[in-house]
């Protein structure tokens, strides 16, 4: 029986037995404790010039990840093209892999933008070593579920985007482009869920 998820050799299906070496265990624990180390060593991104490359972070990106890890609420007002979305995605992946039963929402001004961010996260996940991956329960363009119970969904920002759920992390991308009347309704419906 195959140990890959739906024929994708880069994804481990749920309930796959893995033999951990002592080195794997120590590395897993180090990554769990240090999301910056995890991102530097294991996150892969697509570069326009070089294709798939390691995520070589700047100091401000490391600081962002540490702030996310140490503080429940974060607001970042930053310029374009600074790698902030990639930085956020690397932290969200860390959070989902190393914490059981967490719910994460990736929301953006357009569903396609949120799905693109989820796609970046999925690409990074596919490039993790199999011993670090959680098995896959479901995997598509709008959501994924890992065997540790963690779930990530991608939607457009609206007052009903996350209604009916409880979320450990809500990542709002391009929030400045959300009309005020939608933003107000969104916060009224979302704030009780976090």
Regions found by a protein language model. Name each.
Residues 2-194:
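Phosphate/NTP-binding elements of NTP-utilizing enzymes
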């Amino acid at each position: 029986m195959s140990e890959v998820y739906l024929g994708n050799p880069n994804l481990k299906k749920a309930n796959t037995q893995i033999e951990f070496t002592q080195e794997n265990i120590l590395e897993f624990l180090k990554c769990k404790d240090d999301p910056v180390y995890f991102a530097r060593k294991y996150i892969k991104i697509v570069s326009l010039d070089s294709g798939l490359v390691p995520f070589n972070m700047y100091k401000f990106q490391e600081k962002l990840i540490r702030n996310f890890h140490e503080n429940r609420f974060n607001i970042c007002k930053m310029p374009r093209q600074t790698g902030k979305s990639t930085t956020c995605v690397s932290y969200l992946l860390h959070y989902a892999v190393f914490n059981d039963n967490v719910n994460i929402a990736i929301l953006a001004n357009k569903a396609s933008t949120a799905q693109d961010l989820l796609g970046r996260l999925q690409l990074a996940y596919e490039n993790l070593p199999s011993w670090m991956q959680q098995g896959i329960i479901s995997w598509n363009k709008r959501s994924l579920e890992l065997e540790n119970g963690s779930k990530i969904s991608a939607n457009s920002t609206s007052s009903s985007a996350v209604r009916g759920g409880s979320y450990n992390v809500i990542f709002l991308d391009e929030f400045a482009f959300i009309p005020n009347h939608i933003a107000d309704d969104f916060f009224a419906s979302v704030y009780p869920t976090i």
